[in-house]
């Protein structure tokens, strides 16, 4: 099958979900698309990317040949997994170029693709969610999809400011107290249980964190205000998405518009759902 006949669509992601630092991720219904450039032709709204783009680096590192284009609605540097989605798209596009355009072949290779994407990204939470879809738990090279008994709306409050994940991570402590570690382990377990049983009453306490969120919010007063505003509504829960500055809010679809109206006007609000498909070849 010719290169011109396929492209890859990959969802954005929200990492950590509060306590699940570097382990939990959620795929979201805003997407990045990538495909090979053939005869210099790219689709409307797309752009050819240079060798420094994370998607191009991933494509070449996995054996892809030629140039690639990208078309994306995922905000960059906002905590919605743009770089992770680009890296997943790059390795999946290279795999399709080498092994054929088949989602069955893609599914069979997901563990290897996860490993390649994680090596490039440095942590698995975003890339696992973007590759597999749904809510994912990943560690030690393995990933599982968390069964969901909920069909929530996810509001993403997205300000104009950007955050460098690398710089944000350097601000975090290299050691933890035993009590903080125990709280986060317990909350992560509680969160997985609440999502899989549909017990929304547990979600607020289950998304509380003691490892990274307060440290990051101390340098992001706008995000802190958005998180506080979200938690003053009847939203089920809210968390700092990845390293921020985006704040993710989980709620019932029927409450989404009312909750969105109460978030600070210093950011845009995207009304999203959980993407259940992950990376797909089209």
Spell out what each predicted region is.
Residues 156-218:
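Active-site rim beta-loop-alpha module in soluble metabolic enzymes
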Residues 2, 14-16, 25-28, 79, ...:
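Solvent-exposed alpha-helices and their adjacent loops that cap or buttress functional pockets
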Residues 64-145:
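Gly/Ser-rich oxyanion-binding loop with an adjacent helix/lid
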Residues 36-37, 130-140, 248-252, 282:
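Short beta-strand-to-turn element immediately C-terminal to the catalytic PLP-Schiff-base lysine
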């Amino acid at each position: 099958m010719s290169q011109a006949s396929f492209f890859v669509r990959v969802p954005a992601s929200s990492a950590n979900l509060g306590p699940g630092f570097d382990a939990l991720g959620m795929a979201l219904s805003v997407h990045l698309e990538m495909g090979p450039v053939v005869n210099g032709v790219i689709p409307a709204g797309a752009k050819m990317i240079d060798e420094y783009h994370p998607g191009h680096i991933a494509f070449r590192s996995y054996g892809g040949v030629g140039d690639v284009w990208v078309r994306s609605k995922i905000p960059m540097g906002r905590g919605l997994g743009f770089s992770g989605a680009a890296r997943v798209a790059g390795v999946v596009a290279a795999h399709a170029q080498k092994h054929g355009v088949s989602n069955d072949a893609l599914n069979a290779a997901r563990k290897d693709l996860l490993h390649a994407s994680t090596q490039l990204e440095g942590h698995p939470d975003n890339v696992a969610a973007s590759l597999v879809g749904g809510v994912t738990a990943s560690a030690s090279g393995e990933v599982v999809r968390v069964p969901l008994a909920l069909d929530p709306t996810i509001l993403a409050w997205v300000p104009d400011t950007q955050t460098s994940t690398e710089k944000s991570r350097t601000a975090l402590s290299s050691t933890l107290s035993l009590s903080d570690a125990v709280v986060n382990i317990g909350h992560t377990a509680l969160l997985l249980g609440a999502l899989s049983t549909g017990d929304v009453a547990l979600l607020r306490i289950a998304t509380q964190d003691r490892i990274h969120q307060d440290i990051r919010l101390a340098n992001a007063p706008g995000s802190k205000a958005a998180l506080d505003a979200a938690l003053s509504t009847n939203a089920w829960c809210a968390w700092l998405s990845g390293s921020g500055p985006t704040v993710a809010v989980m709620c019932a679809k029927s409450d989404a518009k009312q909750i969105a109206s109460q978030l600070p006007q210093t950011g845009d609000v995207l009304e999203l759902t959980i993407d259940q498909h992950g990376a797909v070849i089209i």
